[in-house]
Amino acid sequence: MTISSLFDDLRQKTSSILAKREPDISLAEHTYDCLIAIREYLQKNERLWRKEWNKEITLIPFEEAIKLLITSIYFHDIGKATREFQSTLTDKAKSSHPFYAASVLPLDLGKVKNIPLGLLAILNHHTSYYVKTEGSLYEKLDVTSPSFIEGYKEFFDFYPKLVQKIFGLNVLPISPTENSIEDIKRTLLQIKTKKTDNLKINSRNQIERIFYFISGGLVFADHVASEKEFNREGFTPYFKDTGIGGHLANSIKNFKEWRNFQIKSSQTDYSVFIEIPTGDGKTEASLLWTENNLKNKYTKVIYTLPTRVSSNKMYERLKKGVGTNETALIHSDAKFILEEEFPENGDEQKLALEYYLRKFFFLPLTIGTIDSFLVRFLHSGRWDVSRFNLQNSLIIVDEIHSYNPRLLGFLLKVLEKLTNSGNKFALMSASMPDIIKEKFQEHLTFQTIGGILQEKALFEKSPGFIGKRPESLIEALNEVIFEWEKGKNVLVVCNTIREAKSFYKQLKKWFGNNQSESLVLYHSEYTHLDRMLKEDEIYFRLGKMGWSKLRSEKIIVNSSLTEFKKIMHIKLHKKPFILIATQVVEVSLDIDFDVLFTERAPIDALIQRFGRVNRKKLRQRKAAFKIFEKLHTGKKGQWKYPYPKEILDLTWEIIKEGDFNIEDTQKWLNRVYSEGNTFANNWYQKEFEDGYNLYGKALDITKGIGKLSLSEEKLNEFVLRPVEKGLKKISVIPVQIFDAKELYSKGFKEHYLNSLEIYLYRTLANQLAFKKDRWIDIMMNKNYDYFYGVNWGDSEFSPI
């Protein structure tokens, strides 16, 4: 009997049992689709799984793990063969079908170290019934024993035959059991309180790996099958075309040929560290490395960046070459971008599935923030699904220099885990201190591409000359205007929002009514929508975006609602202007200005600011980089500032005036961040080590199979980018926007896009009045507009 005839026989005998409606899919059809999805996956990925499994896992042979995965997939929806579930297909009520499944399956299904991993995977495939560290859904679940439909036993009868036909594997028959709900809950309680506590660290690591192979693999097959059943045209979890290099060449203006380091990247089979100056082609090198390694049976690419803005830009670029159906974006705003890409998809269930597939790395190429990637290694959300999908993936970490020591320490541990699982990585930086790179080399094996020794010509390029000034930046106001009058695009970077706004206010007085034509203020305290518009405005003024690409949105100007394009005249295209910004320009925007005025900052931050001026290091555009020493850091004797004082002082002492090249900045960087300086300070070393140890800490709490579900206070221990004590980050909507845009009648998307995030100082809390809305607080007594952001008044005190 063929596969199709065997399946047809099962389908006919169980035709009355549905798995889902709209479209109607029978349980037999969905089960078959899931089995085919995992068969295709194993055909593409089994080799690498098996290779690393045999080196790392001793608790269960890989062949048995595959059988357990297939068994879990086969029976995961058997709970739908109940009258209780079938009734939900018409009344849209919620179902507990994973629990129903457990009532007819062995309670020791897939037992490893006395933990029934197969049973847990089935229970867990929709909701974390078991795997929570504090409290569990099953403890509160009010469910009665289900009534199974006649014919459900056919699935048990066909199980060995279908598995043998589809996979060529022989499995032992499974007979239906009769477990009460109390039996199931008792089993889960024993697992939680007894069976996981005495596991040694090696066993716990193995249990984690086995569990996400089974649980993650089950969810993978379930969702891939569901996506295809929804008839989404062109969906595939695999690349259709791995020829990224050709797409890249076509996307680069005036492309001639690849550089030596890019060619070397395209021929490298190892993990790499790509060390190349800003604007010289690191991104292209990493993608050429990716193309080469996709040929070696790797099936996914994860490209991480520091911010949502930089992630969005990279997403827009790469999806043009790879295709929307194969490219995903993940970060906190990604859902709203997805809604814009699928406006015709009004079905909430379908849209939720599209979002799920992107959020948990189902698509071949995923671009997103580093946080969205790393959080899955802290057992957050569907960590098991993410970890399964990350297997056999290539990981690109761009702008690695921009992360704090705590995040770097955790990233190092994650890369250790991934390389032990067979993954490869590409780290990229224009300004990574040698001491940090050496910390990574102690734990990881990778090949360095670029650097001063390999690409000396690139590092000998000079973008211009440095001027060190003892006064404050605000005292250079007339110089800024003078440079602008010469027809230059001027970049002014302040270390705090307060200073940026103050500088902008002073320039406004000089420009008067023409300020909107010549000045742009950009910081983090704008609404999400206005930040996107600000980015568009900057690109438009620099000539990197055309008029037709500007968004048609409404903004608040002088307390009134105005069309964005009304303030963006066509004549502003490529017209010289002054951008006053904070650190948001360091990694968020791909911009190129003619001259820089900046407050002094840590050397790595300065290098990033330098990279936003004369980006190509052209001799004919030799630029001035003016750095100002005097800072407003709070009351005398107190240090209220975004950067550590010792790093600021050391940077100021080390950097030299006059002409400089990229090699000089690397030398300064390594002197500031040296073993004797930065790592001699306990705070940096401690933060790095704390980050490195977070993975083991999460594993201890979750026992390798749990979800990190803790109180807010305990969760703070796992924050990768901690904020200063005494601050609370909250989302608010300025009342002017709420009223003018009539948001009280709008949905969550509009509320979110028109909200902004503020750091609420305790000293400021009493000045604010909030009105509770459905989703986000409304800020009542502070003015807001597109040009300035929030007007805090004379006592304004914001962080960065």
Predicted regions mapped to residue ranges:
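Walker A/P-loop
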Residues: 268-290
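Inter-Walker segment of RecA-like/P-loop motor cores
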Residues: 324-379
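Conserved helicase motor
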Residues: 329-340, 497-498, 520-536, 582-586
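Post-DEXD/H (motif II) to motif III coupling segment of the RecA-like Helicase ATP-binding lobe
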Residues: 384-394, 400-455
